From Swiss-Prot:
The keyword Calcium does not apply. The lineage of its organism: Eukaryota, Metazoa, Chordata, Craniata, Vertebrata. InterPro entries: Ribosomal_uL16, Ribosomal_uL16_CS_euk_arc, Ribosomal_uL16_dom, Ribosomal_uL16_euk_arch, Ribosomal_uL16_sf. It is found in: Cytoplasm. This is Ribosomal protein uL16-like. Its main location: cytoplasm. The keyword Ribonucleoprotein applies.
Length: 214
């Protein structure tokens, strides 16, 4: 018996049902890689951030997440180069979906019990996504804005429901506005830390502040 179509599991009807010691025998998720491109690029190298945002409360299968990841990555590598971007899938498929297998061969009525004991066996995993939740993010250089929009537009076709594409006002994957970011770094309010930044508050021990601004 083949895999049941994902449209059967599109809506969030049940409570979250993760893999645990009570829910065993769960198949591995199809998506294994969540960060692609130049992951170790410094925060100041890729100022532009683009996001695909869900417009529905639904479930996205791990197969769909993998298909969208491959689609967006292929376009970005072709248009911006292998080291010209950093892409991140922001959803993880933790919710387990079940299937109550029914036999359809001759004499099946003697073997199966119908809806008696209908709690099914694990079939796969999906990610539960809320309205306004980010599905995928890409950070790159400012001149690649149209390539980011096109990559996310192509990836949208792999998902059910509606999604929106946003070009962020923030700097890359950080939570600080792009127009204030460079000033804050110059004032040493922000310290670059990999693909993110550390915020240095204006209160605290004076010795630390003196060391930082010496």
């Amino acid at each position: 018996m083949g895999r049941r179509p994902a449209r059967c599991y599109r809506y969030c009807k049940n409570k979250p049902y993760p893999k645990s010691r009570f829910c065993r025998g769960v198949p591995d998720a199809k998506i294994r890689i969540f960060d692609l491109g130049r992951k170790k690029a410094k925060v100041d190298e890729f100022p532009l951030g683009g996001h695909m945002v869900s417009d529905e409360y639904e479930q996205l299968s791990s197969e769909a997440l993998e298909a969208a990841r491959i689609c967006a990555n292929k376009y970005m590598v072709k248009s911006c180069g292998r080291d010209g971007f950093h892409m991140r899938v922001r959803l993880h498929p933790f919710h387990v979906i079940r299937i109550n297998k029914m036999l359809s061969c001759a004499g099946a009525d003697r073997l199966q019990t119908g809806m008696r004991g209908a709690f099914g066996k694990p079939q796969g995993t999906v990610a539960r996504v809320h309205i306004g939740q980010v599905i995928m993010s890409i950070r790159t250089k400012l001149q690649n804005e149209e390539h980011v929009i096109e990559a996310l537009r192509r990836a949208k076709f792999k998902f059910p429901g509606r999604q929106k594409i946003h070009i962020s006002k923030k700097w890359g994957f950080t939570k600080f506005n792009a127009d204030e970011f460079e000033d804050m770094v110059a004032k040493k309010c922000l310290i670059p830390d990999g693909c993110g930044v550390k915020y240095v508050p204006s209160h605290g021990p004076l010795d630390k502040w003196r060391v930082l601004h010496s």
